[in-house]
Amino acid sequence: MTMTIPEMVDVVFDISGDSVPVNYPFELWRELVRLVPELEGESSVGVLPLRTTGSDCGMLLPKRAKLVVRLPRSLATQTTPLSGQELNIGGSQLKIGKAKLREIQPYSTIHAHLVVATDDEVAFVENVSARLADLGITASLICGRQNSLLDGDQCVQGFSLVIHDLKPEDSLRLQYNGLGSDRKFGCGIFVPYKAISDLN
């Protein structure tokens, strides 16, 4: 018998800004909670990694950058106060614009840029396989490179992960549930993946 998982949606905000620091996930979450304190107590709420390009000035944001918050559909309206706000991310200013609701789609191949784990890749793959079995999901997986997020003494580490050959219902279940901890820092959140040969 598989567990009941709440239906999740993505709330997609337009954002404008030049760059964010390398350790932005920690500051970003603190700012979001400052503006919407209700988010802090919801372990299912996640913030998708921003699309950035590395440089000597930090992580550069594209002109059409988006901030995406994934959360249960029943909580989507809690993010409404974010529109029109300005975030201070380690000295970088981000202006949050309009929001729209985006339904999660059942792609057969999905990817998470970091699923929290120890540095033991074999144990990681075994744990992921066991977790998929717990969720009633049958699929193939490819473990990517080891990644980490640093913020002073705080370190979150793990591996990137591709899950493929998913049935539509299993794809939705996994995207709704995620894997591992620290969803608030962008970890364990799955998005569509087009080329399973690129695991960066």
Residues of each region from the PLM?
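RNA-interacting cores
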Residues: 1-200
